[in-house]
């Protein structure tokens, strides 16, 4: 019989497993980053940068690729995980390579776009690069 503690633990593991492509994407953007900024160094009418130097094309592309690869790995591992732990998993996970690639791409690219939008919004309210946004 499965108790509530086991359900909670497996739910946490499943959530972390699902969000892993976004985490890998964010970390990889730092590794692959640098180069031309996503905003092409454009400024608004007040002379402020649109996004800043911290969000680059190499980071966007590298992060998205790595998130997609993580999703592909999860797609390959999905059937094995379900076979061995299916009774504990209450959230659907990708069960083949194509699903893994699609989910990995969407989560990885979504994380990169989310970072760029966050940087854009921070610049609009005058928060500098590397400074936390008050939430």
Each model region followed by its residue ranges:
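Interhelical loop and helix-boundary elements at the membrane-water interface
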Residues: 2-135
